[in-house]
Amino acid sequence: MKNILFFATYPIGDKIIDGMAQRIHSIDEEFDRWHRTYIEIGLKTFIKKEHEVLDDGRIDIYRVNLFLHVIFLYHIIKKHSHIYIHSLHNYFKLYFFSLRHHNVTLDIHGTVPEEMAFAGSRFFSSLLSFSEKKLFQTASNFICVSEEMKDYYIEKYPFCSTKNFIIKPIFSQNSFSEVQPEKQLALKNELGIQEDDVVFIYSGNTQRWQNVELTIQSMIKYSVPNHFHILLTGDIKGVKKMMEAMSPEKTFRYIIRSVAPTELGIFYSIAHYGYILRDEHVLNRVAAPTKLIEYLYYGIIPIVKYERIGDSFRLGYVHVNYQDDLSLLTQRKSDKNKEIALVLSSRNSDKKISNYLQTDL
């Protein structure tokens, strides 16, 4: 049995919630015939080394302290030919360990130094930039979520152009399903949606980068009597507070709900337009938002602030700008958008990463 060493927090049970955990879990499934060792490194935590065994001995999980267990880390790195690092965040703690003569794979996840700079942490961004360059010099394989991400890093580090780049977005399949017409009709009746209503949807939370306040402002500004707005969020209280602060007219028709991922599909299936307002930034250009792909799959036409989000733009997705007169929009779905979603989601299965790592160095 082949062996691989992952630097990541192994997601167990109900911890498989956020995007990072879902991706780690999904990649792990591609190595189900390998023995996997997971290392989680703490700076102030794990004073005592923790060890857990799962999957009938096929998975070893270690939680260690960077300073107290440095010898253990040295030996376990030396023992493994294949090393897989989930995100630059996990490599930062390995900066002073030599990974030469190993087959190193970096799952990029996102543009971490740029994310830190965007968040205002310029010092930490500079440190991560040094780490990133060193890792790109050392690693052999790079997992990207989009072609845009691949192109960005090859432009940033031209010396990597001959290395192995694999495009591998991870999209949840929870809401990728056909919805029966009778279920759609039942939901419309429940919500009070009329036959001639144009349905707008927002699916997301209240983080600043999701621009939910701007979304609500746009909904209110361009609303007409036959517009119905659905806001799906895990932060009902936060969205309600924003809505109340903007004091929409009584004629403004909307609902705010929190639903399970498996219930998203039926709401998407009755919507014509979906808000996804992202700022113009490299973080968004190289991304592959699950929400956008879900919108496209159901033929929803995205309402955008910045149109170059991931590979959807280069594939020619149908969209409208949030500054257009949205009051003029009519009922409409896009077959082209669904085709694009199928192309993008197929990248999940047409490249099994473990097949690229068969040769020991």
Language-model regions, residue ranges each:
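Short N-terminal targeting/anchoring amphipathic segment
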Residues: L73-Y91, H102-T105
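N-terminal subdomain of nucleotide-sugar transferases
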Residues: M1-I47, Q217-P225
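Nucleotide-sugar-dependent
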Residues: D18, Q207-Q210, S258, T262-F267, ...
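Membrane-proximal helix-turn-helix segments that form the acceptor-binding/catalytic region
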Residues: V70-K78, F92, V112, F123-C144
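Donor nucleotide-sugar binding/catalytic pocket of nucleotide-sugar-dependent glycosyltransferases
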Residues: K133, Q137-P181
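Nucleotide-activated donor-binding/catalytic signature segment of Leloir-type glycosyltransferases, i.e.
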Residues: K240-Y273
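A charged, aromatic-enriched C-terminal amphipathic alpha-helix characteristic of glycosyltransferases
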Residues: G19-Q22, N321-L361
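Conserved donor-binding/catalytic core segment of Leloir-type glycosyltransferases
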Residues: L5-F7, Q194-Q210, I216-M219
